[in-house]
Amino acid sequence: MKMERKNVWHHRKKEEIEAFSKEYMEFMSKAKTERMTVKEIKRILDESGFVPLEDFAGDPMNMTVYAVNRGKAIAAFRVVDDLKRGLNLVVAHIDSPRLDFKPNPLIEDEQIALFKTHYYGGIKKYHWLSIPLEIHGVLFKNDGTEIEIHIGDKPEDPVFTIPDLLPHLDKEDAKISEKFKGENLMLIAGTIPLSGEEKEAVKTNVLKILNEMYGITEEDFVSGEIEVVPAFSPREVGMDRSLIGAYGQDDRICAYTALRALLSANPEKSIGVIFFDKEEIGSDGNTGAKARFYLKALRQILKMQGAKDSEFVLDEVLENTSVISGDVCAAVNPPYKDVHDLHNAPKLGYGVALVKYTGARGKYSTNDAHAEFVARVRKVLNEQGVIWQVATLGKVDQGGGGTIAKFFAERGSDVIDMGPALLGMHSPFEISSKADLFETYVAYRSLMEKL
């Protein structure tokens, strides 16, 4: 009669969990930005026999294809039947909160060269002070040449940091929003002046080093996207090594588990994954979930299958499609558990979390999954022996947030949010449970096969 929570560690083989976790940590060590994540996912797809959609020339009822959108988003499909029957999709985002270089970032102040940044997504600014940082990104020179920049991820590389104010001089009592200002999030770039240079000699020396390394000039930053991320490798956490600490688990943990599910599932209908950029800032732009790139890919497949009016048929496809919006949620953190309704809050190690709705206040700006669809999902999870739990985003009126679920619901699909719970979400070192990681993979695979 009563609904009881189950601890995953009591029901799964530890060896399975550990093997999956090791591969996940290897993935996370390479997937530090959305561009790097797309490259790694594309590499895995290529090795698994997937081909770019535009290069496919076989049976359109039996396709393993992918489409990349501007190097920042990617969709992959395993088509096994008439697409008009719809698909079972898992969608997620691969951008994470971070710092971005400003268009003209390099300055000198008090003989210290600094990189100016603008934070991206919802961060606590003080998290980013006095920790080692690395930079990754691309610059496009005036002639269109692409230059990749990676500094800080190799043992021999220098790292960067934003030094905090020492406590001895930090006696002023102020609100956090006033004390930690976004404009002050500047990385130390160097302190050695260039010999013979009178004005901004330290800045000029940094530019000289960058020019020697990459052949770039100061103006090239204008057409660049340089991202600042923590210089932390994924690590096992706890005496029992049951947890994983890493940057960017929101939401690359869902992307990885969905990708693995796509590759290992034995589906009865077509399945796919779509990984988006820009979720952390509202899913805007042509690489976010509001964009239409994946719809174009579906239209192309429909045309290959002989659809006469792919636009009309696409509506039918989307209405027949079931979508799992893969996103993380907030696990109960013992010192701060008063922000949760504990009866509806997820715990680490108790399986994948089923989130019927997100939003804020009176369920504003959310997809509230229909009861009929929740029942279908629950049935599959229970029949396949998946360990799951219920989750909401804190107490009513405590705060709120959103996912990409609503954008798929707006196009006619049934959607529900589902993913593992994290501690320290949006921090530079987020914590997940190895058990929940594995159970999320099992859940996504089961739903791809049976939903």
Swiss-Prot record:
Alphabetical list of InterPro entries matching this protein: M18_aminopeptidase_1, Peptidase_M18, Peptidase_M18_dom2
GO cellular component, one term: cytoplasm
Single GO term (MF): zinc ion binding
Stretches of the chain forming a coiled coil according to its record: none
Keywords attached to this entry: Aminopeptidase, Hydrolase, Metal-binding, Metalloprotease, Protease, Zinc
EC number(s) from the headed UniProt entry: 3.4.11.-
Binding site for Zn(2+): H93, H168, H426
GO biological process terms held by the UniProt record: proteolysis
Cofactors named for this entry: Zn(2+)
PANTHER family assigned to the protein according to its UniProt record, in alphabetical order: ASPARTYL AMINOPEPTIDASE, M18 FAMILY AMINOPEPTIDASE 1-RELATED
NCBIfam families cross-referenced by the UniProt entry: PRK02256.1 (NF002600)
Stored HAMAP family: Aminopeptidase_M18_1 (MF_00466)
Family of the protein in this entry: Belongs to the peptidase M18 family.
Protein name: Probable M18 family aminopeptidase 1
Protein's organism: Thermotoga maritima (strain ATCC 43589 / DSM 3109 / JCM 10099 / NBRC 100826 / MSB8)
